[in-house]
């Protein structure tokens, strides 16, 4: 299971990851001051980060062929976890109308975060094993739809539209990167969009909040819209405006004090803007962009060595994190309605933080295998 490559992790990439992690750790602590017992959330986030770093370090030791060998079972195992959330309490747990959590003794676990990695690992394996079949008009179409919809249906039943969109888009972009024909890709994408559209329509007919959130968000100008669905967005923009260039100082923001809902999770970018200003926001954007550009370069390097599985995994990880980061920023800037998209490496949250760090550990391992001696590379995928 464990195998040395003779290489150390890329120091520039590792430094960028740790820098953003520490910055997010400080800001997450500051953002939680207004609503909670700050020390409790500070300790919890510290534990999540330590667990995530320990698991990421473990992933540095595990060769990619281990994931390829067990990708199918990991995917099935995660699907089982997605079904467990529907069990009555104390196992399953519903929060704000969404059934997404499993209760363990000391913490809540969100299987949808695990599915983001499981889908990438399994889709990469599928694209390598079924390289010829996946490009056939009907056979490839049916197989890819089964894989994506098996997770998507469960996520929609959990009322987790955000995870459904991120996971489905990541899988579609991986298919595109693997050379799947645009006609097939269009059919798969169209089917998924239709399914989400029907789900939103049914949700609207049944009085659900998702359809209302979409329609009310864009029905009129944001600042004259008195709907409660845009209140969070308004408060986020007010916070960013208060920060100006250099911010009001760490811990000195006022939006987190009862005005801005979820300041430590989904809307933490607004707190970054208020307390550290445009300078802090640009630091986050440029640092994360550097990490992602390095990641895509790592995926390209693996592909040059004909290690398609490693390349697809690296590409999938970077696609997922880039999508989630971009959507969170757009949400905080009032471009799209608020939704449950944590900011990678920064937002408070156990499941999200741990699995993002695991994914980055796998990405660093891909790079280490690319740079190792040629004699060892024959064992890598």
Q: Positions of the model-derived regions?
A:
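A juxtamembrane structural motif centered on a specific transmembrane helix
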Residues: 1-3, 309, 324-381
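Flexible extramembrane loops and terminal tails that flank transmembrane helices
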Residues: 1-13
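Hydrophobic alpha-helical transmembrane segments of multi-pass inner membrane proteins, especially
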Residues: 14-27, 34-228, 270-331, 358, ...
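Short, small-residue-rich loop/turn micro-motifs
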Residues: 32, 240, 244, 333
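Transmembrane helix boundary and interhelical junction motifs in multipass membrane proteins
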Residues: 160-165, 248-253, 263-265, 339, ...
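TM-adjacent membrane-interface loops and short helices in multi-pass inner/ER membrane proteins
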Residues: 217-265, 279-280
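Extended hydrophobic-aromatic, low-complexity segments
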Residues: 248-249, 279-284, 354, 366
